Structure formats: C-alpha cells, structure tokens
C-alpha cells in the first residue's frame, strides 16, 4: 500500500511487515526529508481517468474487427494490466479515506489482509505489463523478419494461448506474494524479473533495429515489391519502443525504492528517496494514463474506433476530431 496509508496504519497501532512491497518506506527521525503529501483527489482522478481510458481501449479492440490481430490482443492485455493497477490504487485511496475518517471499521487482521490484496494487484499488474510488452516485442520481431510466415506463426489461437499463459503466470505471482509477503525473497524476485525483462527487451530491440535496416534495403530492392506491411511492422516496433520507454520511466523509481528498501533501509539518503513513495505511485498511475494516448496517437484505426465509441455510442451525435493522418 502507499506510504500515506502505511503511516495511518502506524497510527492505528499496526507495524510494518518486512516483505510488504509498498509499506516499507522507512521513517527516520533524523532524515532531512519528509513524506510528500499528495491530495487524495489526485489519486482518485488519475485512477478514474486511467480506468475509463483503458476500458475505451479494450472496447475499441472488441468492437473493430480490423484490430482483431495478435498485436492488438497483446495491447488489450497491457490495457487490462494498466486497468488493474488503476483499480488497485483507486480502491486503496477510497479505503484510506474511509478508515482514517472512521467511516469504516476493520479488525487489524482484515486491514492487513486487504493491504496484501492491493499489493498483490500491483504485483500482478507489473508482471502482466512486462510480459505483455515482451509479447508485443516478439510479435513485432516476427512481423518484420518472418513476414511471409507471420500468419502461420502468430495465429489467433496461439496468441490467445500466450495471453492466457501470461495471466496464469501473473495470478500465480500474485498468489505467491500474498502467501509469502513477509519474505524479502518475493521482492528480490520481482526486481530480478524487472531487470531481466529490461535486458531481454534491450537485446531484442538492438537485434531488431540493426537487422531491420539491412532487411528493409534488401526487400526494397526487389522488383515490384510493396513495402506497406514492412513499414507497418516497423511502425509497430516504434510504438512498442514508446510504450516501453514510458513503462521504464514510470516504474523505475518504484523498483529503485524496492532495491533501496532491501539494501540500505537505514541510510539517510535511501530513506530520503523512499519518503517520496506516493510520488512513485503517481508515476505508476500516469503510465496507465499515457499508454492509451500512445495507442491513439500511433494507430489511425484505433483513433477512428475511439471516435465511433465516444461520439456515436456515448452522445449519439456525430462529432469531428482533427486528424493527423
């Protein structure tokens, strides 16, 4: 849970648990830093905006048959992960308000269990996001370098099985987190997964873009060749690069918090960094808000479907948006 809630727990007489992902912001009386207070309304607003945006993304993918392709199925999986972290922080903020204002009374054990559930949702979300981004990267790789065999390799059934495997794995991770929340090994495993994902993605991208230059030139030299699909694959890879960049920027402070929490919890500088945990949660929620904007900016088909849903389904009146394409 976020650090402000954790401090309220301390006021209620609860102690921090060593394995709690977000409750371990160390307070040091001699630390020159103070917790950064962020209004509850900010968490609620970001959570609600992200929730609505990602519902719109999922609705667009379901509605438009042109988006019924593996890449957008994986994008839908990423949208569900973003929606999950938004729901977690949204309901957590509401719970904070109800508990601290005495509108809700819960036993200590129930509060601690609820804390674990919220943290588990964040754990599931980050693992699902990493796996979905990796799946999109593999899909773009196959699109660019195995273009003629793409339809046979990335079938709808196979992509569905991959998504099912991703969420089964993520749910298992969340369950393990609840069961072993007091163990620092859970946090270490989560950090290791994040760093491994970054290494895999960096290696894949380096290989992808180095070969893409040679591949594009070779295919463009063929007589009568149309490079539309090739450009589409490269465009999808660039979209993925944007998604990955935003993911790293928004989640890196959270994982650095976890690393410092394990390695130097009593150090004043580490304690100072960890005292701003609420800001790192805001960044995580911003990631969920920004992702749908990237989909809309990069995909004309997605943007068109957004217009149809918002203008015709929502208001039942046609409206016009400026097009950049």
From Swiss-Prot:
Lipid moiety-binding region (S-palmitoyl cysteine): 311
Example of a GO cellular component annotation carried by this entry: plasma membrane
SUPFAM superfamilies attached to this UniProt entry: Family A G protein-coupled receptor-like
Subcellular location: Cell membrane
GO molecular function terms attached to this record: melanocortin receptor activity
Keyword Isomerase appears in the UniProt entry: no
Key words, A-Z: Cell membrane, G-protein coupled receptor, Glycoprotein, Lipoprotein, Membrane, Palmitate, Receptor, Transducer, Transmembrane, Transmembrane helix
Membrane topology: Multi-pass membrane protein
Function: Receptor for MSH (alpha, beta and gamma) and ACTH. The activity of this receptor is mediated by G proteins which activate adenylate cyclase. This receptor is a possible mediator of the immunomodulation properties of melanocortins.
Protein family per UniProt: Belongs to the G-protein coupled receptor 1 family.
Name of this chain's protein: Melanocortin receptor 5
Taxonomic classification: Eukaryota, Metazoa, Chordata, Craniata, Vertebrata
């Amino acid at each position: 849970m976020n650090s402000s809630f954790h401090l309220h727990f301390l006021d209620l007489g609860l102690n921090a648990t060593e394995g709690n992902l977000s409750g371990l912001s160390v307070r040091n009386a001699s630390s020159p830093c103070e917790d950064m207070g962020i209004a509850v309304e900010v968490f609620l607003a970001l959570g609600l905006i992200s929730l609505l945006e990602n519902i719109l993304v999922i609705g667009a993918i379901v509605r438009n048959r042109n988006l019924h392709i593996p890449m957008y199925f994986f994008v839908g999986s990423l949208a569900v992960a973003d929606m999950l972290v938004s729901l977690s922080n949204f309901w957590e903020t509401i719970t904070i308000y109800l508990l601290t204002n005495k509108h809700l009374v819960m036993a200590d054990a129930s509060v601690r269990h609820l804390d674990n559930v919220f943290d588990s949702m964040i754990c599931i979300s980050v693992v699902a996001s990493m796996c979905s981004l990796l799946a999109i990267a593999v899909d773009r790789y196959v699109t660019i370098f195995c273009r003629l065999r793409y339809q046979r390799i990335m079938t709808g059934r196979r992509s569905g099985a991959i998504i099912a495997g991703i969420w089964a794995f993520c749910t298992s991770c969340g369950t393990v987190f609840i069961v072993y929340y007091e163990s620092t090994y859970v946090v270490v495993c989560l950090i290791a997964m994040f760093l491994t994902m970054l290494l895999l993605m960096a290696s894949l991208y380096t290989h992808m873009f180095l070969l893409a230059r040679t591949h594009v030139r070779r295919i463009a030299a063929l007589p009568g060749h149309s490079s539309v699909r090739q450009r589409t694959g490269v465009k999808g890879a660039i979209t993925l690069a944007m998604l990955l960049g935003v993911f790293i920027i928004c989640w890196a402070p959270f994982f650095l918090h976890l690393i410092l929490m394990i390695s130097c919890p009593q150090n004043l500088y580490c304690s100072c960094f960890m005292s701003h945990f609420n800001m790192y949660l805001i960044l995580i929620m911003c990631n969920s808000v920004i992702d749908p904007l990237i989909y809309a900016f990069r995909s004309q088909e997605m943007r068109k479907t957004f217009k149809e849903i918002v203008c015709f389904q929502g208001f039942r009146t046609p409206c016009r948006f400026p097009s950049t394409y």
